[in-house]
């Protein structure tokens, strides 16, 4: 689930029900260039995750106030706060399996960057577009987006065609043409809209 306030400028909260982060690894997760996704050099050729360089968490903690709560399976929960890039102490905390990261006051300490933010409305539109892209790319995952207390998206795990209909428009239901092509070592699967769904803007290509 993704919760934002004022287009993410005041609050961004990301919560998942994944494997969680053990308490003794929480500080490592926020150190630059630290990653749990690569164990050997060979892993570089089979990466299928959204990130692996260990930069995202370290970058966000340098420009915001961050709190993380996480619990792995059959383990107690742990919590840690990071302010201005400084890691706090890891503390026991009530938590279910998974991780929740809360980001407050984005760019509060870098006014030069903050001035480039658009209005909360415009930044919110960017958040919605990003969530839509992730939701379409991972239809087997549930996604929920809440903005300023309002439910914007609430998607359950489903097949790709149903996900397209729920994210884009119910009118897409009978207007999609399936693609399923395989050649040698690559394949292409997805859907095209028929002529009734032609748009003048190229933005609806996912």
Label for each model-derived stretch:
Residues 1-206:
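N-terminal phosphate-binding caps/lids of nucleotide- and nucleic-acid-binding domains
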